[in-house]
Amino acid sequence: MGLSPSNISKLFEPFGFEQAKAVIAAVSGGSDSLGLLFLVRDYMAMLQNPPRLIAVTVDHQLRAESKAEAENVGLLCRQYGIEHRILVWDEAKPTSGLAAAARTARYRLLVQAARDVGGAFIVTGHTQDDQIETFLMRKERSAHAEARGLAAMSLRSLLDGLGLEGSVELDRPLLSVSRQTLRDELRGRGINWVDDPSNANTEYERPRIRHGIAAEADRQTVLDQIAEAGAARERDNAALIAALGNPASLRADANGALLVDPQLYAALPGNARRLFSGLLAAIAGGRRFLPGDSERSRIERVLSGDDDTHRLTVFGALIERGDSGSPHRFLREKRNLPKLHLEPGKPIVWDGRFRFLNEGMMDFELAAPGRQELADFLKSQNIEIESRKREALLVSPALYREGRLFALLFLQDGEFQQDIHIERHFAIFDHVLPGHDFDLARAVEARIGRICAEMS
């Protein structure tokens, strides 16, 4: 007995697919993704004006069989009248961190597929089993009892956007459904699936957890723990969001530093305080993730005054404790700043902190100036600035043309080239934004803002 139409409707109805032009279903050929494909197909058949359903298989080219497996998914889709595409990760493969690189490439290709067809949704076949495994993996890695990642996967995430704008939505409708239920569903339909041999290789973390502690764990106990972790994350977010409702809580100054009110910071509950400082370190440092537990503890000791040090560098950020009524300051550390080519018409992100679009005709280079180079440029322009402004310029993007320093961001008297648009980029929100944190991202963005300059 398969899932009833009412059960299928309950799984997919909350996502609002009927408003979409197209929905991309990520289908590898395994039981989870095929179960997803046929359930979402059934749901689309219930809609009066269903969107276009496109199954997309990513061939990572990591196994000799992967091409044939992707083609077999295509044959199955044709048999059932489902549109199908194969996308290939044909880049050089890294010698380490292969699983993470493959995941990043897979989502990049899926996002591009969605954008190509005007789609706003990608759906994946993550199951309740994946949720349990993810929780146990993160719990095993983390020494901090309140680790935010223990809230596990969210039903919704946003990919490759500007916070809540311009993103493609990644949806996981099957997080309440077991893998066994999906396999029973496929057997009832006479549909076979392929088991990826890497899923049985316990040298990898997830298979090791799957065939170890996840197999022995009581499912309901783990699900209750996931719910508790999710509630804790919501409490921390809510406390910080409430504090950010005060306009004095957080602002960006003219030099690009993030300024925090010390009294408001000290009044936050402990976990919300650690979250706040970790978020600002990630934003100032251009990072996609929060600092680790030990790094956030170091920040907390310095900002609380429990450490004699007034400043520290961590996670690419320089952090200074405020004194005598001055705010805490978070800004970029002067290390590992990139040099990028800014082509006409091609948006790029510089250092995880700024998004550029060159709407003109000329090419530029983007890089942070050296100390002597900056001094020479300011002297040539007869510009005098105070030391903090100078330090900020040394970690800010500058425009170069034919090897010459041409213009400086955050220097209003600089000679700016026309048609260069800049806005603030939050790597921690704009790469992947879990549904748990939608409201938090809104609150932070409301205090800091996006637009830096419209150079013309």
UniProtKB/Swiss-Prot annotation:
List UniProt keywords, sorted A-Z: ATP-binding, Cytoplasm, Ligase, Nucleotide-binding, tRNA processing
Q: Name one GO biological process term.
A: tRNA modification
Q: What is its EC number?
A: 6.3.4.19
Q: Name one GO cellular component term.
A: cytoplasm
Top enzyme category: ligase
Compartments in which it is found: Cytoplasm
Binding residues for ATP, per the UniProt record?
A: S28, G29, G30, S31, D32, S33
Keyword match tRNA processing: yes
Write out the catalysed reaction: cytidine(34) in tRNA(Ile2) + L-lysine + ATP = lysidine(34) in tRNA(Ile2) + AMP + diphosphate + H(+)
Name of a matching Pfam family: ATP_bind_3
Under the GO molecular function aspect, what terms does this record hold? ATP binding; tRNA(Ile)-lysidine synthase activity
The family classification in the record reads: Belongs to the tRNA(Ile)-lysidine synthase family.
Q: Which HAMAP family match?
A: tRNA_Ile_lys_synt (MF_01161)
Domain comment quoted from the record: The N-terminal region contains the highly conserved SGGXDS motif, predicted to be a P-loop motif involved in ATP binding.
Question: What is the purpose of this protein?
Answer: Ligates lysine onto the cytidine present at position 34 of the AUA codon-specific tRNA(Ile) that contains the anticodon CAU, in an ATP-dependent manner. Cytidine is converted to lysidine, thus changing the amino acid specificity of the tRNA from methionine to isoleucine.
Q: What is this protein called?
A: tRNA(Ile)-lysidine synthase
Encoded by which gene? tilS
